[in-house]
Amino acid sequence: MVNNILNTAGGAVIYFTPPNDEDLLYVKASFEDENSIEREVIVSSVIDSLSIVGFAEEGTYPVDVIAVDRGENESIPTTINISPLEAPIHGILNSMVGNADFGGINIAYENPTRAEVSLNMSTLDSSGNLVFRESFYTSQANNSYSFRGYDPVSTVFVIYVEDKWGNQTETR
């Protein structure tokens, strides 16, 4: 049933040949992410690939591929292993360059996979506590964003990147 596995940034694409069954309704992939959260991806009977996404960390993860007919009868699972590449959030964080900007900071970044992420910025208050300030949501490939509205005093800015699955980078 499974023909090929293409590991991608934060996931994999599983190519398969659907069973030759007139009663086939869909094919699904069942798996746990690195936080042991059970997830499923379902595609219709006319699709020949499953796109697995949302992994924050590289590693080897088992995935069960299952065919389901109109009576909701499931095939015996075919278990394969995927090995997601580095998640986009890490590459985005590593590409960031911050520069002082009028009333704040400008963050330039690269997002070659056009991942849907948020850049989350915090500052340190006078007691040294981290205080969340704002988020910028983007899926643009290469861009910059200015976090503004701050007094013209020395300010420590702290930033991290988060994806739509709640995966977060360390702070910088």
Give the role of each language-model region:
Residues 1-23, 57, 70-116, 165-172:
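Pro/Thr/Ser/Gly-rich low-complexity, intrinsically disordered linker/stalk tracts
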Residues 12, 17, 26-28, 41, ...:
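Generic alpha-helix signal with a bias toward terminal, lower-confidence helices
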Residues 5-6, 22-58, 120-153:
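Recognizes extended acidic, P/S/T-rich segments that occur
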Residues 25, 48-82, 139-172:
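Beta-strand-rich modules
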Residues 6-8, 15-17, 30-32, 44, ...:
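A structural detector for beta-sheet-dominated domains
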Residues 93-172:
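Ser/Thr/Gly/Pro-rich, low-complexity flexible regions
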